[in-house]
């Protein structure tokens, strides 16, 4: 006997019970240890930060990380999965700053770095219990007891070792360059961090500013040879910018050497801009008084909008960093560059070397002047009228100043894409300063080549989003002017400037006259700031630089750092024992510019090869309407709410099957509820049906029931089952859970809507003959195989099926479905011809039901005929061989198979068409057909009454009735049919005994009273 199955199963409650079974029996640990002799399969876990609560997007990534290793374990692989925690960086610091009410780095300095970092350390696991609970609840099997933690000393030391390898190859340098800078956080950001913070539709100023040309410079240029100022009117160059705050630092104007420029007569002055831009700027009505190429403008000089020296700001030469004397006249040049565009602006580019990457490069190339009037907090410095204001606030003041001086040509607003800090949401500024860089551009070709060795799912990511990122790779600005992070392991001599990179603690301790290390090692600021030693070159004091590492460097170093490579002896075999490279990683698509990149870059820089082989790249989660989830829209769904209502299996199944992994997917409680109804409940109803009838008949599973001559319906479902095993195996082996899951959905649909429905009478009949036992065994085989196929996807319901159907009847069976092997298809049982024939029958039946629906003819009403137009003559044989099934499904008396292209008569036929197929039902009804339809309706009503009266499925009953003349005739004529279908011993005309269940009904417009009694 099987355990009785509740048809109204509470899935969340069932899952909690199964979690206890797994925990009590240590099933996760056993699933790994039992496969220790198998080939290793390695998952790298992208480390989350536990100082924030897990969201539904974390559920998405975790269930996709889970499905493949579960499958691999069932295929015999040894697959220990180590968790990880990302514990450093701005995400952590900002949360602590909020708790302390801090608004700047100065607040941290006053509070004390040691105390601040202590708060950071204690905050990183603030919500770890919620993470652990969610991880267990969704059945993501990962070892969190031995998880790697990026703030651990051993992890940090491996990160130091990795940087030392790059240093020794000449790939680490300090440079004065323009980098993206967060004024709120007071630190540079890497290009992959910047890529995660862009916001579309950001409103900014759009100002067109006039720069007055020095008249005396005109004669020395090509323009002076082509055009002579016919009056005393001043000549201006018109430039455009969206960052007015950078204008006080302007030291050049850039033009395109090969494009045409026009001189316009603006009545009171002349103005130069690119000729292709006249139309867009609506300046075609102004007279053109001169034309030239951009190269003719080179050599012109113009008057500064502001003389910084008047406001207490120095002006320096970029060639030698010398300061310009306060009395020296100041003028700036027109230069030619390749980056001037004719798609926007004026064709004349405002150039401020301190605040633009290309501007800085031009400054170095042409030896421009250099002006820095903004501090690291993004505030205007000096004695400007707008000093002390944040740059974005100063935009209006600067624009107003220029307008008052007659230098503002237009002042508008525009919407464009602008970078914001990926963590604190402050607008970034581009800022020239010293930073430490990893020369990733030196290995660009190796990065691109290595990417070709990685299997990406979806495939277009390889040469698309990720490939493009690698093609346009720039050097990695990895240092951060912050506090809580891996200290940059570079020491500099305070006397001679000698710099050294240290690759480990023992190496550091071996330095001459090393001192400052505390008894309890903590490789963090401020302690690491105190570690000094003597310079080998001059004997001076070697002191560590103050920066910490980009937290993306931490997570990107995990392939080595999680094992404390190369310091632990057992870590040195990672390349030979299957721990490196990873077989599989999985995260959201934005990690192409985050963790996926940092992993790939560090591995390539150190080892010259990729560190992962297969990637599932997940699309984003949207709300029910397809909009991005955000707190401001109040459309964020908390995982607990959905898990408590529908269970983890429903959420998992929805994520696997709703859309291919790389696609964005909508998510809501309603959508998960639909999956529950359409798949899980369908499967559960099959399971419940089987157990109910198997228990009635005391069925004991045995393969002998499928030996010898097997009924065609059973042969078909077993053929479909074995084809399903092949397809699911192939899908998961190809890292495509969606394709595999959808095939399971199709099969469960076949099983429920065709096999079980068409086999019901086989289960209902009283005798346990070979046909009935074959049906039981076939359905049992399907359910047990499904439990194993579903184990990687829906581990709870798979376990429930296995515990009841297998373990309860076979005490020698393995104690969990998750310890069993993945099913292996018996190809000898696959009959493609039979599969195709029955699928054709199902298609014809479905189209026939559609035609009946169009004709408003309920299925219980028998019809005289159905005509089927096929797509090829070859299909006729199979259809006619299985014609009886079509007749039963559509409740018709005759089937006519027409040749392809045959026209169906219009009169008395209603048709449904799909491609080359047409199925048409004859709508004419004879008295005999009407009577039979009424009899079927009576059967339907009696079956409903049995349920309402709470009779058992196997209970026999007596039926009593009172009817008019028409229904009296129907019941007499079809009495045997009615008795058989409703398990009625007799049908009696007249009132039933007292206590009978009764209903008064209307059958096709005729009154009928029915009584049923056991």
Swiss-Prot record:
One of its GO terms (molecular function) is zinc ion binding. ATP binds at residue 631. Its cofactor is Zn(2+). SUPFAM superfamilies: Anticodon-binding domain of a subclass of class I aminoacyl-tRNA synthetases, Nucleotidylyl transferase, ValRS/IleRS/LeuRS editing domain. It catalyses: tRNA(Ile) + L-isoleucine + ATP = L-isoleucyl-tRNA(Ile) + AMP + diphosphate. A motif ('KMSKS' region) lies at residues 628-632. Its EC number is 6.1.1.5. Disulfide bonds: none annotated. Keywords: Aminoacyl-tRNA synthetase, ATP-binding, Cytoplasm, Ligase, Metal-binding, Nucleotide-binding, Protein biosynthesis, Zinc. Its main location: cytoplasm. InterPro entries: aa-tRNA-synth_Ia, Anticodon_Ile_ABEc, Ile-tRNA-ligase, Ile-tRNA-ligase_type2, M/V/L/I-tRNA-synth_anticd-bd, Rossmann-like_a/b/a_fold, tRNAsynth_Ia_anticodon-bd, Val/Leu/Ile-tRNA-synth_edit. One of its GO terms (cellular component) is cytoplasm. It is found in: Cytoplasm. A motif ('HIGH' region) lies at residues 48-58. Belongs to the class-I aminoacyl-tRNA synthetase family. IleS type 2 subfamily. IleRS has two distinct active sites: one for aminoacylation and one for editing. The misactivated valine is translocated from the active site to the editing site, which sterically excludes the correctly activated isoleucine. The single editing site contains two valyl binding pockets, one specific for each substrate (Val-AMP or Val-tRNA(Ile)). Monomer. Catalyzes the attachment of isoleucine to tRNA(Ile). As IleRS can inadvertently accommodate and process structurally similar amino acids such as valine, to avoid such errors it has two additional distinct tRNA(Ile)-dependent editing activities. One activity is designated as 'pretransfer' editing and involves the hydrolysis of activated Val-AMP. The other activity is designated 'posttransfer' editing and involves deacylation of mischarged Val-tRNA(Ile). This is Isoleucine--tRNA ligase. The gene is ileS.
């Amino acid at each position: 006997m099987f355990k009785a199955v509740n048809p109204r199963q509470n899935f969340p409650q069932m899952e909690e019970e199964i979690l206890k079974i797994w925990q009590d029996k240590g099933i996760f640990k056993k699933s790994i240890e039992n496969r220790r002799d198998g080939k290793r399969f390695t998952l790298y876990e992208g480390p989350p930060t536990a100082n924030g609560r897990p969201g539904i997007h974390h559920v998405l990534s975790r269930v996709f990380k889970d499905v493949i290793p579960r499958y691999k374990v069932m295929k015999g692989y040894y697959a220990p999965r180590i968790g990880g925690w990302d514990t450093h960086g701005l995400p952590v610091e900002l949360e602590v700053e909020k708790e302390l009410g801090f608004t700047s780095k100065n607040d941290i300095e006053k509070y004390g770095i040691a105390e601040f970092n202590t708060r950071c350390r204690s905050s990183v696991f603030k919500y770890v219990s919620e993470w652990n609970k969610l991880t267990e609840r969704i059945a993501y099997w990962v070892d969190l007891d031995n998880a790697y933690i990026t703030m651990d000393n051993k992890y940090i030391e491996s990160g130091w070792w990795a940087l030392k390898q790059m240093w020794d190859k000449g790939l680490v340098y300090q440079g004065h360059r323009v980098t993206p800078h967060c004024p709120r956080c007071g630190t540079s950001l890497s290009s992959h961090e910047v890529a995660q913070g862009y916001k579309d539709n950001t409103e900014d100023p759009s100002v067109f500013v006039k720069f007055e040309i020095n008249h005396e410079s005109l004669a020395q240029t090509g323009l002076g040879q082509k055009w002579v100022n016919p009056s005393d009117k001043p000549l201006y160059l018109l430039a455009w910018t969206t960052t007015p705050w950078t204008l006080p630092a302007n030291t050049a104007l850039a033009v395109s050497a090969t494009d045409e420029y026009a001189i316009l007569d603006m009545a009171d002055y002349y103005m130069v801009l690119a000729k292709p831009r006249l139309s867009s700027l609506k300046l075609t009505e102004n007279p053109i008084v001169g034309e030239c190429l951009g190269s003719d403008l080179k050599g012109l000089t113009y008057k500064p909008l502001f003389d910084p020296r008047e406001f207490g700001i120095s002006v320096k030469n970029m060639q030698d960093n010398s300061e310009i004397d306060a009395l020296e006249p100041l003028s700036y040049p027109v230069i030619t560059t390749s980056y001037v565009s004719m798609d926007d602006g004026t064709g004349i580019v405002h150039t401020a070397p301190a605040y633009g990457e290309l501007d800085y490069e031009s400054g170095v190339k042409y030896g421009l002047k250099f002006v820095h009037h903004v501090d690291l907090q993004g505030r205007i410095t000096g004695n400007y009228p707008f000093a002390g204001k944040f740059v974005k606030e100063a935009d209006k003041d600067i624009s107003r100043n220029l307008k008052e001086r007659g230098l503002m040509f237009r002042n508008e607003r525009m919407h464009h894409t602008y970078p914001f800090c990926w963590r604190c949401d402050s607008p970034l500024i581009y800022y020239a300063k010293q930073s430490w860089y990893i020369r990733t551009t030196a290995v660009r070709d190796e990065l691109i080549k290595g990417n070709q060795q990685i299997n990406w799912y979806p495939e277009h990511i390889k040469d698309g989003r990720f490939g493009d990122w690698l093609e346009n790779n720039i050097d990695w600005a990895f240092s951060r002017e912050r506090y809580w992070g891996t200290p940059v392991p570079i020491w500099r001599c305070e006397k001679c400037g000698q710099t050294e990179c240290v690759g480990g603690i023992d190496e550091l301790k071996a330095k001459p006259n090393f001192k400052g290390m505390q008894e309890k090692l903590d490789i963090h600021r401020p302690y690491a700031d105190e570690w000094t030693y003597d310079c080998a070159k001059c004997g001076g004091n070697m002191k560590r630089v103050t920066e910490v590492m980009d937290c993306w460097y931490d997570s990107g170093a995990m392939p080595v750092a999680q094992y404390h490579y190369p310091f632990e002896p057992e870590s040195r075999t990672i390349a030979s024992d299957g721990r490196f490279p990873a077989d599989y990683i999985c995260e959201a698509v934005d990690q192409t510019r985050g963790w996926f990149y940092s992993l790939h870059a560090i591995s390539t820089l150190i080892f010259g090869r990729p560190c992962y082989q297969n990637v599932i790249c997940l699309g984003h989660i949207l709300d029910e309407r397809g909009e991005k989830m955000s707190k401001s829209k109040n459309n964020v769904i908390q995982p607990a709410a959905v898990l408590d209502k529908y269970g983890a299996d429903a959420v998992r199944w929805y994520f696997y099957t709703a859309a291919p992994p790389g696609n964005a997917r909508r998510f809501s409680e309603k959508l998960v509820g639909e999956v529950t109804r359409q798949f899980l409940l369908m499967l559960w109803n099959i399971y419940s049906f089987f157990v109910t009838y198997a228990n009635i008949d005391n069925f004991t599973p045995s393969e002998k029931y499928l030996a010898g001559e097997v009924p065609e319906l059973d042969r078909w479902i077993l053929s479909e089952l074995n084809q399903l095993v092949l397809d699911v195996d192939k899908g998961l082996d190809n890292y495509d859970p969606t394709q595999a899951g959808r095939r399971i959905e199709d099969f469960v649909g076949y099983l429920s809507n065709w096999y079980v429905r068409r086999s019901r009478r086989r289960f209902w009949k009283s005798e346990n003959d070979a046909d009935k036992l074959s049906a039981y065994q076939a359905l049992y085989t399907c359910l047990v195989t499904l439990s194993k196929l579903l184990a990687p996807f829906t581990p709870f319901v798979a376990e429930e099926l296995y515990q009841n159907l297998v373990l309860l009847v076979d005490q020698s069976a393995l104690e969990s479905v998750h310890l069993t092997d993945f099913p292996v298809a018996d190809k000898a049982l696959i009959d493609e011809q039979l599969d195709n024939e029955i699928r054709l029958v199902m298609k014809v039946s479905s189209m026939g039901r559609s035609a009946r629906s169009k004709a408003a003819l309920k299925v219980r009403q028998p019809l005289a005929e159905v005509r089927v137009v096929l797509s090829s003559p070859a299909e006729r044989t199979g259809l006619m061989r299985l014609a009886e099934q079509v007749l039963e499904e559509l409740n018709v008396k005759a089937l006519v198979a027409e040749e392809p292209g045959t026209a169906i008569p219009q009169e008395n036929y209603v048709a449904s068409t799909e491609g080359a197929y047409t199925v048409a039902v004859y709508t004419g009804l004879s008295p005999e057909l009407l009577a039979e339809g009424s009899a079927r309706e009576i059967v339907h009503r009696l079956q409903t009454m049995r349920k309402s009266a709470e009779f058992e499925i196997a209970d026999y009953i007596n039926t009593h009735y009172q009817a008019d003349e028409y229904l009296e005739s129907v019941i007499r004529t079809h009495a045997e049919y009615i008795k058989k279908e409703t398990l009625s011993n007799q049908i009696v005309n007249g009132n039933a005994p007292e206590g009978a269940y009764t209903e008064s009904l209307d059958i096709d417009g005729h009154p009928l009273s029915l009584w049923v009694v056991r």
